[in-house]
Amino acid sequence: MMNFKMKNKTLFLCLPAMLNIPFGGSSAFGANSEKDNKENSPKRPNVLVLLTDDQTFSTIHAWGNNEIQTPNMDRLVNQGMSFTQTHVMGGLNGAISQPSRAMLLTGRGLMDVHRNGQVIPKNEKTFPELFRENGYTTFGTGKWHSDKAAFNRSFSTGANIFFGGMHPYGNEKEEKGHRCPYLHEYDPTGKYKNGQWVNASLNTFSSELYADAAIKFIETNASNDNPFLMYVAFTSPHDPRNVLPDYGRKYDSKEITMPKNFITQHPFDNGDLNERDEKLLPTPRVPEQVLAERANYYSMVNEVDVQIGRILDMLEKSGKDDNTIIVFAADNGLCVGEHGLLGKQNLYEAAV
Protein backbone atom coordinates (compact mmCIF):
# COMPACT_ATOMS: atom_id res chain seq x y z
CA MET A 1 0.00 0.00 0.00
CA MET A 2 1.28 3.45 -0.87
CA ASN A 3 0.85 6.34 1.51
CA PHE A 4 0.55 9.53 -0.56
CA LYS A 5 1.62 12.80 1.01
CA MET A 6 -0.08 15.43 -1.06
CA LYS A 7 1.07 18.65 0.62
CA ASN A 8 3.23 19.23 -2.43
CA LYS A 9 1.66 18.35 -5.72
CA THR A 10 2.58 14.83 -6.80
CA LEU A 11 2.36 13.99 -10.48
CA PHE A 12 2.88 10.70 -12.27
CA LEU A 13 3.27 10.01 -15.97
CA CYS A 14 2.22 6.40 -15.85
CA LEU A 15 -0.55 4.30 -14.36
CA PRO A 16 0.92 1.70 -11.95
CA ALA A 17 1.41 4.07 -9.00
CA MET A 18 -2.21 5.17 -9.17
CA LEU A 19 -3.51 1.65 -8.78
CA ASN A 20 -1.96 1.39 -5.32
CA ILE A 21 -4.07 4.18 -3.82
CA PRO A 22 -5.53 3.04 -0.47
CA PHE A 23 -9.31 3.37 -0.78
CA GLY A 24 -9.89 3.04 2.98
CA GLY A 25 -13.13 1.97 4.67
CA SER A 26 -14.11 -1.61 4.00
CA SER A 27 -11.91 -1.86 0.92
CA ALA A 28 -9.93 -5.00 0.27
CA PHE A 29 -6.84 -2.79 0.38
CA GLY A 30 -6.90 -2.72 4.20
CA ALA A 31 -8.24 -4.74 7.13
CA ASN A 32 -8.64 -1.92 9.65
CA SER A 33 -12.05 -1.02 10.99
CA GLU A 34 -14.00 1.84 9.43
CA LYS A 35 -13.40 3.91 12.58
CA ASP A 36 -9.64 3.31 12.48
CA ASN A 37 -9.51 4.19 8.80
CA LYS A 38 -11.35 7.46 9.33
CA GLU A 39 -9.04 8.44 12.19
CA ASN A 40 -5.71 7.26 10.83
CA SER A 41 -5.95 7.21 7.04
CA PRO A 42 -4.85 10.23 5.02
CA LYS A 43 -7.47 12.07 2.99
CA ARG A 44 -8.08 10.06 -0.14
CA PRO A 45 -6.50 11.77 -3.16
CA ASN A 46 -8.34 12.79 -6.29
CA VAL A 47 -7.08 11.33 -9.57
CA LEU A 48 -6.90 13.05 -12.96
CA VAL A 49 -6.06 10.85 -15.96
CA LEU A 50 -5.07 12.71 -19.14
CA LEU A 51 -4.82 10.52 -22.24
CA THR A 52 -3.79 11.68 -25.70
CA ASP A 53 -4.32 9.87 -29.00
CA ASP A 54 -1.45 8.73 -31.27
CA GLN A 55 1.16 10.86 -29.49
CA THR A 56 4.66 9.46 -29.83
CA PHE A 57 7.12 9.84 -26.96
CA SER A 58 9.43 12.24 -28.82
CA THR A 59 6.85 15.05 -29.04
CA ILE A 60 7.47 16.51 -25.58
CA HIS A 61 9.88 19.41 -25.30
CA ALA A 62 11.06 18.47 -21.80
CA TRP A 63 12.13 15.07 -23.10
CA GLY A 64 14.60 16.63 -25.51
CA ASN A 65 12.69 17.76 -28.59
CA ASN A 66 13.63 21.41 -29.05
CA GLU A 67 11.51 21.77 -32.19
CA ILE A 68 8.22 21.54 -30.33
CA GLN A 69 6.76 23.67 -27.55
CA THR A 70 4.75 21.78 -24.91
CA PRO A 71 4.88 23.96 -21.77
CA ASN A 72 2.06 22.18 -19.95
CA MET A 73 3.27 18.66 -20.63
CA ASP A 74 6.66 19.98 -19.50
CA ARG A 75 5.02 21.02 -16.21
CA LEU A 76 4.07 17.41 -15.63
CA VAL A 77 7.53 16.15 -16.55
CA ASN A 78 9.34 18.67 -14.37
CA GLN A 79 7.10 18.22 -11.32
CA GLY A 80 6.56 14.50 -11.58
CA MET A 81 7.92 11.08 -12.37
CA SER A 82 8.42 9.86 -15.94
CA PHE A 83 8.27 6.21 -16.93
CA THR A 84 10.35 6.05 -20.12
CA GLN A 85 10.43 2.29 -20.73
CA THR A 86 6.72 1.59 -21.17
CA HIS A 87 5.55 0.13 -24.47
CA VAL A 88 2.31 -0.74 -26.24
CA MET A 89 1.82 -4.41 -27.10
CA GLY A 90 0.31 -3.70 -30.52
CA GLY A 91 -3.06 -5.02 -31.64
CA LEU A 92 -4.86 -7.68 -33.64
CA ASN A 93 -6.05 -5.22 -36.28
CA GLY A 94 -5.28 -1.69 -37.44
CA ALA A 95 -7.08 0.06 -34.57
CA ILE A 96 -4.20 -0.08 -32.08
CA SER A 97 -5.81 2.41 -29.71
CA GLN A 98 -8.73 0.09 -29.02
CA PRO A 99 -6.76 -2.73 -27.34
CA SER A 100 -4.24 -0.33 -25.81
CA ARG A 101 -7.01 1.56 -24.00
CA ALA A 102 -8.68 -1.67 -22.93
CA MET A 103 -5.35 -2.91 -21.57
CA LEU A 104 -4.84 0.34 -19.65
CA LEU A 105 -8.39 0.27 -18.29
CA THR A 106 -8.37 -3.38 -17.20
CA GLY A 107 -4.71 -4.20 -16.57
CA ARG A 108 -4.94 -7.15 -18.96
CA GLY A 109 -2.51 -8.05 -21.72
CA LEU A 110 -3.23 -7.95 -25.44
CA MET A 111 -4.23 -11.61 -25.74
CA ASP A 112 -6.52 -11.35 -22.70
CA VAL A 113 -8.67 -8.34 -23.58
CA HIS A 114 -12.03 -9.29 -25.07
CA ARG A 115 -12.45 -8.90 -28.85
CA ASN A 116 -9.35 -6.73 -29.16
CA GLY A 117 -10.83 -4.27 -26.64
CA GLN A 118 -14.04 -3.65 -28.56
CA VAL A 119 -16.07 -4.88 -25.58
CA ILE A 120 -15.11 -4.96 -21.89
CA PRO A 121 -17.25 -7.68 -20.23
CA LYS A 122 -18.78 -7.20 -16.79
CA ASN A 123 -16.32 -9.63 -15.23
CA GLU A 124 -13.35 -7.51 -16.36
CA LYS A 125 -13.27 -4.56 -13.99
CA THR A 126 -11.91 -1.24 -15.22
CA PHE A 127 -9.89 0.90 -12.84
CA PRO A 128 -12.53 3.70 -12.88
CA GLU A 129 -15.08 1.03 -11.96
CA LEU A 130 -13.00 0.05 -8.92
CA PHE A 131 -12.73 3.67 -7.85
CA ARG A 132 -16.47 4.10 -8.25
CA GLU A 133 -17.20 1.01 -6.16
CA ASN A 134 -15.03 2.49 -3.42
CA GLY A 135 -16.90 5.75 -3.12
CA TYR A 136 -15.23 7.96 -5.74
CA THR A 137 -17.20 10.18 -8.08
CA THR A 138 -15.98 9.04 -11.49
CA PHE A 139 -16.20 11.36 -14.50
CA GLY A 140 -15.45 10.62 -18.14
CA THR A 141 -15.09 12.86 -21.17
CA GLY A 142 -13.61 12.44 -24.63
CA LYS A 143 -12.82 9.23 -26.46
CA TRP A 144 -14.19 5.87 -25.38
CA HIS A 145 -13.15 3.10 -27.76
CA SER A 146 -15.06 0.24 -26.12
CA ASP A 147 -18.74 -0.49 -25.49
CA LYS A 148 -21.19 1.95 -23.92
CA ALA A 149 -22.13 -0.46 -21.12
CA ALA A 150 -18.52 -0.52 -19.92
CA PHE A 151 -18.46 3.28 -19.95
CA ASN A 152 -21.52 3.47 -17.69
CA ARG A 153 -20.12 0.87 -15.31
CA SER A 154 -16.94 2.91 -15.08
CA PHE A 155 -18.33 6.43 -14.69
CA SER A 156 -21.07 7.90 -12.55
CA THR A 157 -21.17 11.02 -14.70
CA GLY A 158 -19.65 12.52 -17.83
CA ALA A 159 -20.03 15.04 -20.64
CA ASN A 160 -18.91 15.55 -24.25
CA ILE A 161 -18.40 11.82 -24.73
CA PHE A 162 -17.06 10.52 -28.05
CA PHE A 163 -17.81 6.87 -28.76
CA GLY A 164 -15.55 5.58 -31.51
CA GLY A 165 -12.02 5.47 -32.81
CA MET A 166 -11.46 8.71 -34.69
CA HIS A 167 -13.14 11.68 -36.32
CA PRO A 168 -13.79 10.15 -39.76
CA TYR A 169 -13.67 11.30 -43.33
CA GLY A 170 -16.51 10.75 -45.76
CA ASN A 171 -19.08 13.50 -46.05
CA GLU A 172 -19.01 17.26 -45.71
CA LYS A 173 -19.85 17.21 -42.01
CA GLU A 174 -17.41 14.45 -41.10
CA GLU A 175 -14.55 15.94 -43.10
CA LYS A 176 -14.43 18.82 -40.63
CA GLY A 177 -13.04 16.22 -38.24
CA HIS A 178 -12.12 17.64 -34.86
CA ARG A 179 -14.15 20.77 -35.55
CA CYS A 180 -17.38 18.79 -35.80
CA PRO A 181 -17.31 15.74 -33.47
CA TYR A 182 -20.38 13.65 -32.74
CA LEU A 183 -20.77 13.86 -28.96
CA HIS A 184 -23.06 12.52 -26.26
CA GLU A 185 -24.01 13.76 -22.84
CA TYR A 186 -24.01 11.23 -20.01
CA ASP A 187 -27.02 8.91 -20.27
CA PRO A 188 -27.77 6.96 -17.05
CA THR A 189 -29.75 4.42 -19.10
CA GLY A 190 -26.66 3.60 -21.17
CA LYS A 191 -28.56 3.82 -24.47
CA TYR A 192 -26.91 6.99 -25.82
CA LYS A 193 -29.38 7.55 -28.66
CA ASN A 194 -29.33 11.36 -28.64
CA GLY A 195 -25.84 12.32 -29.74
CA GLN A 196 -25.31 15.52 -31.69
CA TRP A 197 -22.86 16.87 -34.23
CA VAL A 198 -21.09 19.95 -32.94
CA ASN A 199 -21.72 22.91 -35.25
CA ALA A 200 -18.49 23.42 -37.18
CA SER A 201 -19.34 27.09 -37.70
CA LEU A 202 -18.65 27.63 -34.00
CA ASN A 203 -14.94 27.24 -34.85
CA THR A 204 -14.31 25.13 -31.79
CA PHE A 205 -12.10 22.03 -31.58
CA SER A 206 -12.51 18.60 -30.02
CA SER A 207 -9.79 19.08 -27.39
CA GLU A 208 -11.37 22.34 -26.24
CA LEU A 209 -14.74 20.63 -25.85
CA TYR A 210 -13.26 17.87 -23.69
CA ALA A 211 -11.30 20.40 -21.63
CA ASP A 212 -14.47 22.48 -21.19
CA ALA A 213 -16.27 19.44 -19.79
CA ALA A 214 -13.39 18.67 -17.42
CA ILE A 215 -13.17 22.28 -16.23
CA LYS A 216 -16.91 22.42 -15.57
CA PHE A 217 -16.68 19.22 -13.53
CA ILE A 218 -13.84 20.65 -11.42
CA GLU A 219 -15.77 23.89 -10.87
CA THR A 220 -18.91 22.01 -9.86
CA ASN A 221 -16.99 19.84 -7.38
CA ALA A 222 -14.69 22.53 -5.95
CA SER A 223 -16.53 22.57 -2.61
CA ASN A 224 -17.26 18.84 -2.56
CA ASP A 225 -15.07 16.79 -0.21
CA ASN A 226 -15.89 13.49 -1.89
CA PRO A 227 -12.84 12.28 -3.87
CA PHE A 228 -13.10 12.09 -7.64
CA LEU A 229 -11.49 10.33 -10.56
CA MET A 230 -11.50 12.18 -13.88
CA TYR A 231 -10.74 10.42 -17.16
CA VAL A 232 -10.06 12.97 -19.92
CA ALA A 233 -9.33 11.18 -23.20
CA PHE A 234 -8.40 13.54 -26.02
CA THR A 235 -8.75 12.55 -29.68
CA SER A 236 -5.75 14.69 -30.63
CA PRO A 237 -3.14 14.53 -32.18
CA HIS A 238 -4.88 11.73 -34.13
CA ASP A 239 -5.71 12.77 -37.69
CA PRO A 240 -7.51 14.42 -39.41
CA ARG A 241 -5.07 17.19 -38.56
CA ASN A 242 -7.24 20.21 -39.31
CA VAL A 243 -6.24 22.34 -36.33
CA LEU A 244 -7.51 25.92 -36.42
CA PRO A 245 -5.08 28.89 -36.28
CA ASP A 246 -6.39 30.04 -32.89
CA TYR A 247 -5.61 26.74 -31.19
CA GLY A 248 -1.99 26.54 -30.16
CA ARG A 249 0.97 27.20 -32.40
CA LYS A 250 1.03 26.44 -36.11
CA TYR A 251 4.37 24.95 -37.17
CA ASP A 252 6.03 25.53 -40.50
CA SER A 253 7.58 22.53 -42.25
CA LYS A 254 10.78 24.57 -42.61
CA GLU A 255 11.15 24.46 -38.82
CA ILE A 256 10.97 20.66 -38.71
CA THR A 257 13.80 18.22 -39.33
CA MET A 258 13.31 14.84 -40.92
CA PRO A 259 13.84 11.82 -38.63
CA LYS A 260 17.18 10.14 -39.22
CA ASN A 261 15.48 6.85 -40.06
CA PHE A 262 13.27 8.38 -42.77
CA ILE A 263 13.06 6.47 -46.02
CA THR A 264 10.66 7.07 -48.90
CA GLN A 265 9.05 3.65 -48.70
CA HIS A 266 9.00 0.77 -46.25
CA PRO A 267 11.30 -1.98 -47.61
CA PHE A 268 8.76 -4.80 -47.31
CA ASP A 269 5.03 -5.34 -46.94
CA ASN A 270 4.35 -5.86 -43.24
CA GLY A 271 0.70 -6.67 -43.93
CA ASP A 272 -0.61 -3.27 -42.82
CA LEU A 273 0.49 -0.96 -45.61
CA ASN A 274 -3.10 -0.57 -46.80
CA GLU A 275 -4.40 0.75 -43.48
CA ARG A 276 -6.00 4.18 -43.63
CA ASP A 277 -3.04 5.78 -41.81
CA GLU A 278 -0.66 4.69 -44.54
CA LYS A 279 -2.92 6.13 -47.25
CA LEU A 280 -2.64 9.70 -45.93
CA LEU A 281 0.29 10.24 -48.30
CA PRO A 282 1.19 8.34 -51.47
CA THR A 283 4.28 6.16 -51.74
CA PRO A 284 7.10 6.58 -52.31
CA ARG A 285 6.97 9.41 -49.75
CA VAL A 286 8.04 12.85 -50.91
CA PRO A 287 10.19 14.49 -48.19
CA GLU A 288 8.40 17.84 -48.47
CA GLN A 289 5.03 16.18 -47.92
CA VAL A 290 6.28 14.23 -44.92
CA LEU A 291 7.72 17.40 -43.35
CA ALA A 292 4.38 19.14 -43.86
CA GLU A 293 2.63 16.22 -42.18
CA ARG A 294 5.06 16.36 -39.26
CA ALA A 295 4.47 20.11 -38.92
CA ASN A 296 0.71 19.52 -38.73
CA TYR A 297 1.29 16.73 -36.22
CA TYR A 298 3.35 19.06 -34.00
CA SER A 299 0.60 21.69 -34.28
CA MET A 300 -1.91 19.14 -33.02
CA VAL A 301 0.31 18.20 -30.08
CA ASN A 302 0.70 21.86 -29.18
CA GLU A 303 -3.06 22.34 -29.47
CA VAL A 304 -3.84 19.59 -26.96
CA ASP A 305 -1.06 20.90 -24.69
CA VAL A 306 -2.92 24.22 -24.46
CA GLN A 307 -6.08 22.43 -23.32
CA ILE A 308 -4.16 20.37 -20.76
CA GLY A 309 -2.89 23.67 -19.38
CA ARG A 310 -6.43 24.98 -19.00
CA ILE A 311 -7.39 21.91 -16.96
CA LEU A 312 -4.29 22.13 -14.76
CA ASP A 313 -4.93 25.83 -14.14
CA MET A 314 -8.52 25.18 -13.09
CA LEU A 315 -7.41 22.35 -10.82
CA GLU A 316 -5.00 24.75 -9.13
CA LYS A 317 -7.62 27.51 -8.92
CA SER A 318 -10.06 25.10 -7.25
CA GLY A 319 -7.54 24.27 -4.53
CA LYS A 320 -7.73 20.58 -5.40
CA ASP A 321 -4.27 20.33 -6.95
CA ASP A 322 -2.41 19.57 -3.71
CA ASN A 323 -4.52 16.46 -3.21
CA THR A 324 -4.69 15.23 -6.80
CA ILE A 325 -2.58 12.61 -8.52
CA ILE A 326 -2.21 13.40 -12.22
CA VAL A 327 -1.52 10.62 -14.71
CA PHE A 328 -0.54 11.61 -18.25
CA ALA A 329 -0.11 9.03 -21.00
CA ALA A 330 -0.85 8.30 -24.66
CA ASP A 331 -2.62 5.24 -26.00
CA ASN A 332 0.18 4.52 -28.49
CA GLY A 333 2.76 6.29 -30.62
CA LEU A 334 2.93 6.97 -34.34
CA CYS A 335 5.40 6.86 -37.20
CA VAL A 336 5.36 10.12 -39.16
CA GLY A 337 7.98 9.37 -41.78
CA GLU A 338 10.07 6.97 -39.70
CA HIS A 339 10.93 3.85 -41.73
CA GLY A 340 8.75 5.17 -44.57
CA LEU A 341 5.57 4.78 -42.49
CA LEU A 342 2.73 7.02 -41.33
CA GLY A 343 0.88 4.70 -38.95
CA LYS A 344 1.17 2.77 -35.70
CA GLN A 345 0.52 -0.72 -37.08
CA ASN A 346 4.11 -1.77 -36.46
CA LEU A 347 6.55 -2.39 -33.62
CA TYR A 348 9.05 0.37 -34.37
CA GLU A 349 9.98 2.57 -31.43
CA ALA A 350 8.02 5.63 -32.59
CA ALA A 351 4.80 3.58 -32.69
CA VAL A 352 5.07 1.63 -29.45
Which role fits each region the language model picked out?
Residues 2-13:
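Bacterial N-terminal signal peptides that target proteins for export
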Residues 13-24:
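Bacterial N-terminal signal peptides
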Residues 23-352:
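Formylglycine-dependent sulfatase
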